Amino acid sequence: MKYLYIICVLFWNITVILVAAPEKAQVMELLEGRHWSLDAEEFHSLGEGTDRLLIEISADKSLINYLRFRALEALSLFPSENTAVFLESFADNSFAPLARRGFEALRRGFFKTQPKRVKKAAVRLLKHRNAQVRISAARFIRSVDAPRFKHFLKSEKNSWVRKAAQE
């Protein structure tokens, strides 16, 4: 009888683990589709661990970029410390299209709860080597720190970047 009880407990624990953690395939399925839109309820319904899978997908260079872009966008739904650190690092170190989307996900996911953190990342990105990333950061700075935005306009070398940042 004791062994039956132990087997039942083990089976229950394994079942809970399998049900609780989302599979990568489930997350990938939510990222696919021709007319994709971010559905917060769908992603949150996958439960705990979804953010870790989205980070894994975002960082996977073997995947096609549109899946990585969508994974970054979905990460904005999971405002944890782990997500913030990943998005900050991603914005600083990735190639331009991913860096810009990483910053935009950071802005969407953390501006209400950690505005100073987002501003700090944006200030760093004002000096990014890619113009599109600088434009994205400058547009954010324009909305939160007018003097710093004016300083950016004075220091930016490319006139088209200055113009785009003001649009």
How would you describe each model-predicted region?
Residues 62-64, 94-97, 129-130, 157-160:
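Short inter-helical turns and helix N-cap capping residues of alpha-solenoid HEAT/ARM repeat scaffolds
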Residues 2-20:
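Classical Sec-dependent N-terminal signal peptides that target proteins to the secretory pathway
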Residues 21-28, 47-59, 80-92, 112-126, ...:
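Amphipathic alpha-helical scaffolding segments comprising HEAT/armadillo-like alpha-solenoid repeats
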Residues 28-48, 66-80, 89, 100-113, ...:
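Structural detector for internal amphipathic alpha-helices that build alpha-solenoid repeat scaffolds
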Residues 11, 34-38, 61:
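Short, flexible helical or helix-coil boundary motifs
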